[in-house]
Structures are given as C-alpha cells and as structure tokens.
Amino acid sequence: MSQYMMVAVAAVVAVAGSSQISRRSTGGTQEQEILNELLSNYDMRVRPPPSNYSDPMGPVTVRVNIMIRMLSKIDVVNMEYSMQLTFREQWLDSRLAYAHLGYHNPPKFLTVPHIKSNLWIPDTFFPTEKAAHRHLIDTDNMFLRIHPDGKVLYSSRISITSSCHMQLQLYPLDLQFCDFDLVSYAHTMKDIVYEWDPLAPVQLKPGVGSDLPNFQLTNITTNDDCTSHTNTGSYACLRMQLTLKRQFSYYLVQLYGPTTMIVIVSWVSFWIDMHSTAGRVALGVTTLLTMTTMQAAINAKLPPVSYVKVVDVWLGACQTFVFGALLEYAFVSYQDSQRQTEQAKSRAARKAQKRRAKMELVEREQYQPPCTCHLYQDYEPSFRDRLRRYFTKPDYLPAKIDYYARFCVPLGFLAFNAIYWTSCLVMVSRLV
C-alpha cells in the first residue's frame, strides 16, 4: 500500500510541475500569441473602422504631435530651412484591440516596430518638403505601440529640409513666417481627418531656436486652415507655423556701422584744400569703390527679388552721399579753373596795358620810400586763428561751396537716418 501511495504522490507532483511549466511558458509568449491572434485576420490594405462609431462610414481621426529636436541652416538665398523632429501619429484601430481576448494581466501596451510593414499606417506627406530622410543608425529610429483598446502610436525621427516663402522687403529687420504642412496623399477627408494633440501639439527640445546664428525662433502656432482642394477631392491638412526673427545686432556691426563710417570718411574731402586734386580724387574714388564692393557682398547673400528692400534704400542712399561728395569736388574744381582762367586773362590784359603806358610816359625820377622790411616779423597763426579761418564763410564761390557742404551734407545724412529708421520701426510694428 505504501508503494501505491508513493506512486500517487509522485504523479500529483509531476502533474503540478507540468502545469506550472505550462503557465510560465504561456506568460513568456503572451505578447507573441497576442500579435499572432491580432494579425491572423488583419488586412493592412483596408483603413481602420471610423473613430466615431455612430457614423459607420466616417473617417479615421489621426492625432498628430511633433517634437522639434533641432532647427538649423536657415538659407535665405534658397528660401529653405532644415530641422530634425520626432513625428508622432496616433489613431484608433479597433481590429488591434486585445483587451477582450481574455488574457490574464495583459501588457499595458505592445511595442512592435518590426511589424510596421504588416499594419495600416497613415499615408502622411509634407508638401513643403525639399529633402528628407529617416534615421537608421544604429537601428531604424521609429516605434509602433499598440494599446489594449486598439489605440496605435507611431513615432519616427526625421530630418527634413523644407521650403519657406520669405518676404524680404524689411530685410534685415524682417520677420519670417515658415509654414510646415502635413497632408494625406491618397485619402480624402472622407477617409482621414487630422487633428493636433490638444495637450501639446508641438514640443521644443531645450535650447532649440535660441542658438541660431542669424535668427531667433520667437513663436510657434498650429492650425488646420490649409485643407487642400483638388480635382480628386479634398484632403485634410495640419499646419505648423514658425515665426523667425532676424538678429539685428549682426547687421548693425557688419552692415550699418561700416557703411556709415564710409559715408563720414567721404566728408573729409570737404575740408581738404580744393587745389589738392590728387588727395580729394583719391579719397572720393576709394570710398566709392569700397561702398560698391560692400553693396555687392551684401546682395550676394540674398536671392534676386523683384522688389526693393529696406537695405537697398540704405545702401543706395549711402552710395549717393559718397558719389555726391565726389561730384561736389568736380563742380568745385571746375568753378575754380574757370575763375583762374578769367583772372589769367585779366592779368594779361593789365600787363599789356602797362607796357603800352610805359612807352608813352616820359622818363622821370620816381620816389622810392625807405625800406621798412626789418620792422615786420614773421607771424605764426594760432590754432584759434586757423579754426576761425575754416569756419569763416569765404567770398570765393568754389570755397563757399565747400564751406556749405561741410555742414549741409552731414545734416542731410542725419535727416535721412531719422526718416529711414522711423519708417522701418513703423513697418516692423505692423508685422508684430
């Protein structure tokens, strides 16, 4: 009898052990069994049932969330910018729900990036894209997450170069508004409707937008006012708009400061003696060539546009002031040469008259006053006398032109600055 009891106990232990092994095996392969059961009758060619069960023919709602990881290479010439982002889409596919399958303690979600090719994915594309790629190092930077109720989260890391239609009328005081759109390529609004995540539609990695060399990201707005209507139907669209403010401090140092100094240097010509032709011409030509070179260098960084920019007004005015200084000397030199020609003719006429008078006069003793040369000493003018001579209005017309130019031209440049900067501030305030 004892032998029978021992055999019975051994049998019970063996059955219990095999049952425990079976439960452990079932727990270890639970996710695999869930996936096999979900995909057994799944057809990726058919879109999921509508999100709104009350409308059996309604569209699938795809909720979108974007995280901007990097913003760089804002190219004004090609009107484009580059950014790296994490693009997330979320939708409900009731065919993938596994809460009702009866598994004990099912997982909170299934992370299954390897079955992407077996699932229905929204055919989202970016209309403003010029170039883009997904990151594959060390593996494909994406994941798929399936929740018990059938909610699917698809996330992917993308680098994209997108076009941005820039308005450069206020360059370099401009604000740029760059639109980033996403649309379904094949499904109309009867099949897919996009909506932004109401909690956080766009997220920024810390530091993004504040480390750009010439711009600063000041604002991000989202909307859905970009629905595309074509002859094949209406396609839902979402839009993210980036507001980029150009950093003016760079252009103050590299553009406005140097050009202002060139204009001021050209005014030195008004203080140089009108008979110093070589010095005044060399100064005028040098400043004019420098101004032209700077203008060409600045325009090389901009696209050829058909409208006038505020920087064109500034450069044109500076070049006008520099060229005007050179023309002023040309006019002064011409007036001086005309005056000297008239004086030479007058002296020649007086000399001829004196010669004729000498021939008619009878020689007579002429009185010579005693020499008083030793009574006078050489006089060295003081600094005050020299300063007074510079600021005393002359009677000679060419010198009078130089005199007025010394004061009128700087005042004219100051008046231009007042009008220019006031107009710029008014136009910029209308954009903000």
UniProtKB/Swiss-Prot annotation:
InterPro entries: GABAA/Glycine_rcpt, GluCl_TM, Neur_chan_lig-bd, Neur_chan_lig-bd_sf, Neur_channel, Neuro-gated_channel_TM_sf, Neuro_actylchol_rec, Neurotrans-gated_channel_TM
Transmembrane feature ranges: 250-272, 278-299, 307-327, 403-426
Keyword Ribonucleoprotein appears in the UniProt entry: no
GO molecular-function terms, A-Z: chloride channel activity; extracellular ligand-gated monoatomic ion channel activity; transmembrane signaling receptor activity
GO cellular component terms listed in the entry, alphabetical order: chloride channel complex; postsynaptic membrane
Keyword Signal among UniProt keywords: yes
Major place of residence: membrane
Entry binding sites for L-glutamate: 69, 88, 155, 184
Record keywords: Cell membrane, Chloride, Chloride channel, Disulfide bond, Glycoprotein, Ion channel, Ion transport, Ligand-gated ion channel, Membrane, Postsynaptic cell membrane, Receptor, Signal, Synapse, Transmembrane, Transmembrane helix, Transport
Family classification: Belongs to the ligand-gated ion channel (TC 1.A.9) family. Glutamate-gated chloride channel (TC 1.A.9.4) subfamily.
Purpose of the protein: Glutamate-gated chloride channel subunit; channel properties may be modulated by the formation of heteromeric channels. Glutamate binding triggers a rapidly reversible current, while the anti-helmintic drug ivermectin triggers a permanently open channel configuration.
NCBIfam families to which the protein is assigned, alphabetical: LIC
Protein name: Glutamate-gated chloride channel subunit beta
Natural source organism: Haemonchus contortus (Barber pole worm)
Lineage: Eukaryota, Metazoa, Ecdysozoa, Nematoda, Chromadorea
